[in-house]
């Protein structure tokens, strides 16, 4: 059985929501909710938070989680994941779990990680969910993905893909969780930045344009993510409905 490491990148200096990982949802911080829900995964061998901020690091340690300090110079979350992967050499699959999804379902993590484990020929795995609301399909901030018959990504775009010109075909929204083959992850930054990546502002297109396979795990629903204080209020109401926090 391959050893699988889950990594939750957590930055304090978010431009739209400074201090976001430490925002309170009930009596717990958002990073604690994310960590505790991710730890319910049945396939992760280890779970760590990767942060460049000592405040986040100390909060994670205080609630009993594992945290590692990383450089503050990383231009992306992927670079932070690479630094952590270099510190944990015994893991062959690395799962990048978004720190701003406090209600993440363990089944999503299990699905993405297991898909990567069962397809060593693919460099990466990620997830998608059926896109049923057309207004969301044309939303530039919601990334769409086209999937081939073998469950592999053909292309990711912020635009509406595929076109609904002649017939209505299923639409899928990409979810920001990734399972990486360790060897591929460590060489990722040596791949040249692609024109597609620059055009769409989507890192995963670097792998696509270089000819690497990305498997897609189809999830039934997308969880709520927090980008702004307004998003946090939506999550708080959702947690109340779930009876995870009190009214």
From Swiss-Prot:
SUPFAM superfamilies: Nucleotide-diphospho-sugar transferases. It catalyses: 3-deoxy-alpha-D-manno-oct-2-ulosonate + CTP = CMP-3-deoxy-beta-D-manno-octulosonate + diphosphate. GO terms for molecular function: 3-deoxy-manno-octulosonate cytidylyltransferase activity. The keyword Nucleotide-binding does not apply. InterPro entries: Cytidylyl_trans (IPR003329), KdsB (IPR004528), Nucleotide-diphossugar_trans (IPR029044). Keywords: Cytoplasm, Lipopolysaccharide biosynthesis, Nucleotidyltransferase, Transferase. Its EC number is 2.7.7.38. This is 3-deoxy-manno-octulosonate cytidylyltransferase. It comes from Leptospira interrogans serogroup Icterohaemorrhagiae serovar Lai (strain 56601). The lineage of its organism: Bacteria, Pseudomonadati, Spirochaetota, Spirochaetia, Leptospirales. The gene is kdsB.
């Amino acid at each position: 059985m391959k050893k699988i490491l889950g990594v939750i990148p957590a930055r304090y200096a978010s431009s739209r929501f400074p201090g976001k990982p430490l925002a309170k949802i009930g009596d717990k911080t958002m990073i604690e909710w994310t960590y505790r829900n991710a730890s319910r995964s049945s396939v992760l061998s280890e779970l760590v938070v990767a942060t460049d901020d000592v405040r986040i690091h100390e909060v994670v340690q205080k609630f009993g989680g594992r945290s590692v300090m990383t450089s503050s110079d990383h231009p992306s979350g992927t670079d932070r994941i690479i630094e952590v992967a270099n510190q944990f050499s015994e893991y062959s699959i690395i799962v990048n779990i978004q720190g701003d999804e406090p209600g993440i379902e363990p089944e999503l993590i299990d699905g993405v990680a297991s898909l990567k484990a069962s397809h060593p020929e693919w460099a990466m795995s990620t997830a998608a969910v059926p896109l049923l609301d057309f207004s969301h399909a044309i939303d530039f901030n919601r990334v769409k993905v086209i999937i081939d018959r073998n469950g592999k990504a053909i292309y990711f775009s912020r635009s509406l893909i595929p076109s609904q010109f002649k017939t209505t075909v299923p639409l899928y929204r990409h979810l920001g969780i990734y399972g990486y083959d360790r060897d591929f992850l460590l060489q990722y930054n040596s791949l040249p930045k692609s024109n597609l990546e620059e055009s769409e502002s989507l890192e995963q297109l670097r792998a696509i344009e270089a000819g690497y396979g990305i498997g897609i795990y189809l999830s039934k629903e997308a969880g709520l993510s927090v980008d702004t204080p307004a998003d946090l209020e939506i999550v708080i109401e959702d947690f109340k409905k779930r009876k995870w926090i009190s009214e």
